[in-house]
Regions:
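Sec/Tat signal peptide C-region and signal peptidase I cleavage site
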Residues: 15-19
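Short, exposed beta-strand-loop hairpins at the edges of beta-sheets
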Residues: 95-106, 112-120, 124
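Bacterial N-terminal signal peptides
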Residues: 7-14
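Central antiparallel beta-sheet cores of small beta-barrel/beta-sandwich binding domains
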Residues: 22-23, 29-94, 102
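Positively charged n-region of N-terminal signal peptides that target proteins for export
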Residues: 1-4
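Short loop/turn positions at the edges of beta-strands in beta-sheet-rich folds
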Residues: 29, 85, 108-109, 122
Length: 131
């Protein structure tokens, strides 16, 4: 009986661990891009790996003029996300469409990723789907 209980607990822990795995490739809301989320030490980051507009699009809206000539494909847009109880939080998300960076939190919702950007008390949530 003790072995059965331990086996069930281990099985449940592996399912919970898998359910919280947000790493991998995600299609952004609207399907214009794909982001690869990856572990970097104890934090998560995410970089653009595909753009509908093609891989030659530049980061022209970046407020740092020295970065305006870099390609968006390969650019980190999610940085510094730390694991919390129910979500990854405390990170930043860069929006290449307007060149602004926002506070960010993400959480898994089935096969969807809820990506929330904050500006003060205001926020916007996007739903990304696993590729």
């Amino acid at each position: 009986m003790k072995k059965l209980v331990i086996s069930l607990m281990l099985a449940m822990m592996s399912v919970v661990g898998y359910a919280q795995n947000v790493t991998g490739r995600w299609v952004t809301e609207g399907g214009d891009s794909q982001v690869e989320i990856y572990q970097s030490g104890d934090k998560l980051c995410g970089k653009i790996v595909w753009l509908k507009a093609g891989d030659g699009k530049l980061d022209s809206k970046n407020p740092d003029k020295s970065l305006q000539s870099r390609k968006l494909v390969g650019c980190d847009i999610l940085t510094g996300l730390k694991k919390g109880k129910e979500k990854w939080e405390g990170g930043k998300i860069y929006n290449p469409k307007n060149g602004k960076t926002y506070k960010c939190a993400i959480c898994l919702d089935g096969n969807n990723l809820k990506v929330r950007g904050y500006l003060g008390v205001f926020y916007e949530t996007q739903t990304w789907t696993r590729k």
